[in-house]
Structures are given as C-alpha cells and as structure tokens.
Amino acid sequence: MDFAAAKIAIDRLIDPNVDAAAVGRELDRLTRAVVSRTPAGLTPRARMDVLLSTLYTAGDWNDHRPFRYDLDDPMGRRRENKLLSTYLRTRKGNCVSMPVLVAILGQRLGLVVTLATGPEHVMTKFAGGENWLNVEATAGGYKWDSSYERDLDISARALETEIYLRPLAPREAVGVMASTLMEALAAQGRADDLMAVADMVLAVNPTDVVAIIQKANAYYLQLQQRYNSRYARPTDIPPGLQADYAMRSRANLEWFAKAEALGWHPPTAQNRTRYLQSIDQEKDTRGQL
C-alpha cells in the first residue's frame, strides 16, 4: 500500500485541482534530502531522527523553511489545510497533514511506519526495534502512549477495545486518511457518498470510530434530506415510507451507540479549552523567539 499515492488520490477527490505531479515531485525532493543527510549504517531510530530534523530544523535541505505546526488552525478546521499539497506549499500543518507526511516519507525510506489515532488526533507509529514508538509529528519528537492517554483523555474502555493508539495495518491507515474526505462529503450534504466511503473504511477496520460516527451522520443527513425537509411531522410521511424512515432513525442512534460502546465519547469543552490554551502559550513562546 503506497501511502503517498493513496493520500494524493484521496485529496484529489476532495479537490480535483490538486496537482498530483507537483506533489509527487516535492515528495521526491524531500526524500532525496533525507537520503543525502543519512550516513550509512544508522539504526532505524537514528534514520527517523534524520527524517524529522530534515522536516523541522531549518537548513539548506528544506530551503531554510522548516515545516511547523499551524497555530492558527491547529485542528485543521479549514479542510484545505489537511491536503498534502497545502502543507507542502505553506509548510504549516496540523494533526492530520503532519503525521501523514512523516508516514509517507518513512515508507519511502524503507522504515516500518504506519498511523495510529487518538480522539481528534493522528500520530505516526514507528517500529524502531522490538517496540513501536509514537512520533508526535506536530512537535517533531517522540511521545509515550501514557502521555496520549492522559493528554487526550482516552478512556479505559477505549484502550481495551484498541480504537486508539493501535498501530494500524496499511489499509487501515489509508482509512484514517479518508477521514478528511468523509468530512468534506458531510459538509456538502452528500449523504449517500458519505455512507459509501464510511462503509469502505469499516470493511477494512470495523472499529474505526471516525467512520462509525460518519456513518451515523450519513443516516442523519439522509433523514434530513428524504423526510425532515419534506414533512412537518413523522406522521405526515406516507405509509409506504414509514419503515424506511424508522430504519434510518434507528440506525442513526445505533451507530452512535456502537461508538460509545467501544469507548468513544464526544470531546469535552474542558479538554478543548485546555488544548487551545496550550496553543495560545505556544504562540506567545514563538513570538518571543
């Protein structure tokens, strides 16, 4: 599974104007830059260190334009900021584009890499020996699972069901990349297409909670488009459509319940406030540099 090809294909479904050839050329350039800075005989961990420094430390290898966390849009709320082409152009990334680029380059360099997820977060997993290491791409370093458990408020149930922090199989990692496509389809109200993509992701990883939630959202959008926008009350729906309406209403709730049973919970205002405060502190720190 070629992570670069998959990410470019997904991004072009979101924005057909993405220049696949230009993205490929920039990935080639970055790959060559890492290779040129990597002495022979390094351990996998040391090779990953070179990859990270090539991205995040200013030098001739990145035209003195290091890649950085976008503190103005850290969550990638502006969907175009999650596109690989945007990240490569602006050098400002988020918790989707940054780990995906590390995984793409790591794969090209022959390192054992994949993606893993946390609540509203994606990280790169790297096999540096017998154990997997978390590469926190937004900070350009490494992080323990226990730190994510604390910082992201991951529940004991979520750890038990392994919906978070598990090193994903390559096809499952591509499903994580498809989360941005699902966001775009939901925003456009393309309920049937959203359902189709969610089903494809779930066929590969039945416990992908983002896809589970998006499947619930797809049922909600179908209800809005087919019934709630046309009929003032459920009793006004024609008898021949009542069974379909009931099925979709039930399925919407059932898929949300499935996510909760796996240990997912909606982000709390407290956690988001704490995270945004850390971003403000980082902005102040950068302003003092």
Q: Where would I find each of the regions flagged by the language model?
A:
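A structural boundary/capping signal
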Residues: 1-289
